[in-house]
């Protein structure tokens, strides 16, 4: 859901939940024992309770309300987001688009939604992309650093436990600040593809640098290149937040078909947690057995996922949710490359049809079928 000329600010709550400073504080203030490891876990209850409390005052999703034919409430919800009146033209136009998107579609239960994911190739592709995005997000190595940063910093020369925890805390602050900047200033102005492509390439280079450093200098003693590698860890956090920190969640929810979005995002969320667990379990073994190869794996994965986005995912920035389906119609590869950095130069004069051109063509086809006494295809009903 997106109103014209309205930019939604996605909250960086997920970045705020990292208790790195709590870990640092208890390590220097509380003697080793059960309380020292229990307290950081207990503290995480606080943001969860606050999140639950404040969600009680949030309006329902306009699309959820439209699906249940509560149109007046949907208009109020849209107006709340846009900070305008429910009767304003922008709200009514967006509401009409949402209603049209649901027209002719029955309300599906969760199991039925999973069955409908293979309805056709286009729907299947739109359902797969969110899970692929979250799969790649985990293989970028972000949770390997989040969970094992003290060990990683120690391997890079910060031997003291307190110092490594402090360095981990600084890493968390860097990610939090960068997340706020990206959500406020970058994600809408740069677009989804640019942030994912440039962020993936940059974070991949940082991982490859760290892997190369550890391969050449396995001894944790400090040399001049050690400081460059420590900076590379922080730059990795910056570039991750720039691209693969939150953009996969935004892009995934946008490309998912509206009538299947709950099931699609449930599958994407399940993929996230499955591979979070896989990375958490695999990283210690990887660091112990392939050492520097661990960073190379994450670096190569980051470059690969940037390449996949470049060639296989269309740009959704500025496109209302109700029009995203048109991005997957006709010459999808051309559209994906055209939207990518440097893509227009590569394609030369070749261009994909615009959304308006696709709508007009679909309308003409529907009119022809109606004139011949045939029902218009559902996919061409706007």
Region spans (language model):
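Alpha-helical transmembrane bundle of multi-pass membrane proteins
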Residues: 1-80, 102-382
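Cytosol/matrix-facing amphipathic helices and coiled-coil assembly/linker segments
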Residues: 90-104
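Short intracellular "coupling" helices and adjacent cytoplasmic loop segments at the cytosolic face
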Residues: 80-94
């Amino acid at each position: 859901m997106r109103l014209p000329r309205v930019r939604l600010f996605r909250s960086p709550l997920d970045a705020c939940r990292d208790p790195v400073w709590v870990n640092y504080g208890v390590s220097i203030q509380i003697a080793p024992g059960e309380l020292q490891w229990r307290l950081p876990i207990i503290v995480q209850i606080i943001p969860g309770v606050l999140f639950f409390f404040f969600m009680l005052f949030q309006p329902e999703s306009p699309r959820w309300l439209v699906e249940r034919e509560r149109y007046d409430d949907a208009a109020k919800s849209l107006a709340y987001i846009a900070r305008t009146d429910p009767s304003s033209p922008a709200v009514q136009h967006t509401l009409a688009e949402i209603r049209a998107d649901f027209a002719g579609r029955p309300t599906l239960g969760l199991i039925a939604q999973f069955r409908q994911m293979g309805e056709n190739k286009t729907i299947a592709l739109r359902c797969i992309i969110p899970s692929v995005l979250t799969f790649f997000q985990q293989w970028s190595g972000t949770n390997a650093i989040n969970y094992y940063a003290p060990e990683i910093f120690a391997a890079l020369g910060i031997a003291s436990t307190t110092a490594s925890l402090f360095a981990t805390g600084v890493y968390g602050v860097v990610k939090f600040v960068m997340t706020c900047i990206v959500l406020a200033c970058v994600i809408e102005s740069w677009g989804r593809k640019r942030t994912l492509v440039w962020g993936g390439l940059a974070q991949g280079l940082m991982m490859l640098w760290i892997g190369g450093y550890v391969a050449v200098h396995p001894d944790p003693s400090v040399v001049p290149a050690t400081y460059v590698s420590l900076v590379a860890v922080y730059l990795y956090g910056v570039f991750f937040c720039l691209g693969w920190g939150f953009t996969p969640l935004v892009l995934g929810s946008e490309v998912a078909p509206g009538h299947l979005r709950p099931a699609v995002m449930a599958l994407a969320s399940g993929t996230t947690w499955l591979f979070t667990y896989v990375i958490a379990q695999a990283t210690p073994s990887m660091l112990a057995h392939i050492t520097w190869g661990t960073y190379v794996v994450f670096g190569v994965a980051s470059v690969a996922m940037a390449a996949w986005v470049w060639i296989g995912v269309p740009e959704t920035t500025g496109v209302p949710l109700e029009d995203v389906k048109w991005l997957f119609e006709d010459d999808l590869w051309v559209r994906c490359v055209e939207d990518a950095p440097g893509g227009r130069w590569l394609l030369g004069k070749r261009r994909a049809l615009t959304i308006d051109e696709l709508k007009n063509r679909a309308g003409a086809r529907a009119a022809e079928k109606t004139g011949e006494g045939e029902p218009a295809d559902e996919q061409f009903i706007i």
